[in-house]
Swiss-Prot record:
InterPro entries: PFN (IPR048278), PFN_euk (IPR005455), PFN_sf (IPR036140), Profilin_CS (IPR027310)
Protein name listed in UniProt: Profilin-6
Organism, as annotated: Olea europaea (Common olive)
GO molecular function, one term: actin monomer binding
Description of how the protein assembles with itself and partners: Occurs in many kinds of cells as a complex with monomeric actin in a 1:1 ratio.
This protein's record includes keyword Disulfide bond: yes
Length: 131
């Protein structure tokens, strides 16, 4: 299966009648492996900050997490594995695997729990595949 198929079929899938606003799979250095059509472009320093938060949980909490210059308030996650952010009626979930970052961005009416489920399920699958 291609990386694009993972995004199209597993991240942008319908969940209880709703879809993510955008999604992508990136390498740890920020290289885009596959993305939805309207996924925002990360700046290199944003990826650096996110990766540092995985290595040093809580690093982004004081400043927030930035994605394409949009600021997300960092909310609960799983240290070293999942970072979550909230911005208005939407938010973001990022799951770190051995080689990739699985990213989902949502807006209402999709819920944070639905976004978490979609992103983390694919991330867990990729980890089991050694990725």
């Amino acid at each position: 299966m291609s990386w694009q198929a993972y995004v199209d079929e597993h991240l942008m899938c319908e969940i209880e009648g709703h879809h993510l606003a955008s999604a992508a799979i990136l390498g740890h250095g920020g290289t885009v492996w596959a993305q939805s059509a309207d996924f925002p472009q990360f700046k290199p320093e944003e990826i650096t900050g996110i990766m540092k938060d995985f290595d040093e949980p809580g690093h982004l909490a004081p400043t927030g997490m930035f994605v394409a210059a949009a600021k997300y308030m960092v909310i609960q996650g799983e240290p070293g594995a999942v970072t979550r952010g909230k911005k208005g009626a939407g938010g973001i979930t990022i799951k770190k695997t051995g080689q990739a970052l699985v990213v989902g961005i949502y807006d209402e009416p999709m819920t944070p729990g639905q976004c978490n489920m979609v992103v983390e399920r694919l991330g867990d699958y990729l980890m089991k595949q050694g990725l």
